[in-house]
């Protein structure tokens, strides 16, 4: 059911229909299934679009615990409860973290951005380029443009465009040269 219902939660979220998103999510819970991080993230996004701060942060705390529990349940038994996050699970919180950073910074909760970023970092999770972009936007909103520019310059990867590297540039829908008709 989750594969059917999670996209519906996301669709309602994008339209700002938080009550409808809640109803669909409740239908998922009524099936007896434990909602995945994907489903929880869809609901988190609905709360973000609705501007419901209490709901965003309550659900974020739950998402964070679920991610930690997921990592611990798949960790080797010998590694213990405080085992580091496995490499293949380090990105579990990337999307929900971006949602929380965006919401907190747009709400003027700049200290909360730092708090949640550090919480995720201490737990051993990784950040993706979207997280870093959201952090840059949050820093700019907090009037910390210099820090945002430092992240852009030193953290975000910069791959020059093909034309700058002397590579041939082709139209977006053109076939690659090796497969072009002769």
Report residues per predicted region.
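A basic, Ser/Thr-enriched alpha-helical scaffold prevalent
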Residues: 1-182
């Amino acid at each position: 059911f989750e594969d059917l219902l999670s996209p519906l939660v996301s669709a309602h979220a994008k339209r700002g229909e938080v009550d409808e998103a809640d109803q669909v999510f409740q239908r998922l819970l009524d099936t007896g299934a434990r909602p995945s991080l994907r489903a929880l993230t869809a609901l988190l996004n609905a709360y973000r679009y609705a501007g419901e701060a209490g709901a965003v942060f309550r659900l974020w705390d739950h998402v964070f615990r679920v991610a930690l529990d997921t990592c611990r349940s798949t960790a080797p038994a010998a590694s213990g409860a405080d085992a580091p996050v496995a490499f293949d699970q380090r990105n579990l919180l990337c999307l929900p973290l971006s949602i929380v950073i965006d919401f907190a910074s747009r709400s003027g909760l700049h200290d909360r951005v730092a708090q949640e970023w550090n919480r995720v970092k201490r737990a051993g999770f990784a950040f993706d380029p979207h997280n870093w972009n959201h952090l840059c936007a949050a820093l700019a909103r907090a009037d910390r443009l210099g820090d945002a520019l430092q992240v852009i310059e030193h953290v975000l990867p910069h791959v020059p465009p093909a034309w700058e590297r002397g590579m041939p540039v082709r139209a977006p829908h053109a076939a690659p040269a090796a497969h072009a008709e002769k």
